[in-house]
Amino acid sequence: MKFFIDTANLEEIKHAHELGILAGVTTNPSLVAKENVSFHDRLREITSIVSGSVSAEVISTDAAGMIAEGEELAKIAPNITIKVPMTPEGLKAVKAFSEKGIQTNVTLVFTANQALLAARAGATYVSPFLGRLDDIGHNGLELISTIAEIFNIHGIETEIIAASIRHPHHVTEAALRGAHIATVPYKVLMQLFNHPLTDQGIEKFLADWNRQK
């Protein structure tokens, strides 16, 4: 499973990139708004750092508007992926982008049927939202398993991005259940490194080394 980072913060992206684990970035209008910067300028900055997929979301609600927005976003860099909502109009846009060779990420996926529809429209990625399903008492991780099984049975190449990741357990379980990618907030990404026994082991090795000097 690959790691994307879910942020529009440049310092977070730079740090994750320096760690050597970053395969891509996902953004959305809310994340960009927090940064108080030009959307297009920030995308240029991100794509100058990250060579993998960088998801940029359209805000139009009709297919024609999404296509117009997406075509402009795709001009920023060849690794821009157009993030499109899981709606009938969104899937019309996905089909058009697919025919033009523009990558797409269908977001706000909450059912296996939605994921299958998006894949058949030509989506490069689908993003089921784990945390938001958990919030309403549904099993987001089970959804990952179901989508992965359906895609495997039918030979579908669309990749599954586990999104709305809230904690490290989501990451582990998404990997076990067949997600191709986890897009992870910076805070959760850094939590993946931590275990008290790792810290204790380092301290012991250093103490032992210093004693023998």
From Swiss-Prot:
Instruction: Spell out the reaction equation it catalyses.
Output: D-sedoheptulose 7-phosphate + D-glyceraldehyde 3-phosphate = D-erythrose 4-phosphate + beta-D-fructose 6-phosphate
Q: Which NCBIfam families does this chain map to? A: fsa_talC_mipB
Record SUPFAM superfamilies? Aldolase
Where does the record place it?
A: Cytoplasm
Q: Which InterPro entries does the annotation name? A: Aldolase_TIM (IPR013785), TAL/FSA (IPR001585), Transaldolase_3B (IPR022999), Transaldolase_3B/F6P_aldolase (IPR004731), Transaldolase_AS (IPR018225), TSA/FSA_arc/bac (IPR033919)
Reported function = Transaldolase is important for the balance of metabolites in the pentose-phosphate pathway.
Please, which domain of life does this record's source organism belong to? Bacteria
Give the GO molecular function terms. aldehyde-lyase activity; transaldolase activity
Q: Does the keyword GTP-binding apply?
A: no
Name this polypeptide is given: Probable transaldolase
Write down the EC number. 2.2.1.2
Keyword annotations for this protein, in alphabetical order, are: Cytoplasm, Pentose shunt, Schiff base, Transferase
Biological process, per Gene Ontology: carbohydrate metabolic process; pentose-phosphate shunt
Extract the Pfam families matched here.
TAL_FSA
State which gene encodes it: tal
* GO CC annotation terms, alphabetical: cytoplasm
Where, by residue number, is the active site? 83 (schiff-base intermediate with substrate)
The similarity comment for this entry is:
Belongs to the transaldolase family. Type 3B subfamily.
According to its UniProt record, in which pathway does this protein act?
Answer: Carbohydrate degradation; pentose phosphate pathway; D-glyceraldehyde 3-phosphate and beta-D-fructose 6-phosphate from D-ribose 5-phosphate and D-xylulose 5-phosphate (non-oxidative stage): step 2/3
